[in-house]
Amino acid sequence: MAKKTHISETPATAWLKAHGVVFTEHPYEYLEHGGAQHSAAVLGFDPFAVVKTLIMQDEAAKPLAVLMHGNRTVSTKNLARQIGRKSVEPCKPEVANRHSGYLVGGTSPFGLKRAMPVWVEATVLDLPAIWINGGRRG
């Protein structure tokens, strides 16, 4: 379902513009707990090409962002091993909101409130195009 055509700027879209990144906006009706699968279905995109941004933390409660295909899950055990941490776990929504500056369900890796490492599933980089949240739900 299409949403209004005027879309206000977010820290993510401001960051993209400031860095000369070409992008198009695809608003949709947000569904609580719908996730990347819902946005992919509503917009008619392949869920594998819809990339979700997850805010996690390591054993020292230091935040990190993880970019993963919309139809895949993150193995926190494998992630911790890959990035040299003892453990990694998803942040509680209120903690993720505080670290990122975005509401869960509208998190973008661009324009994050707090600087943090961003880890990308390697196969995301093989895609010719991706759809990723622009800093707002919907």
What are these regions (language model features)?
Residues M1-G138:
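Extended, low-hydrophobicity, polar/charged segments
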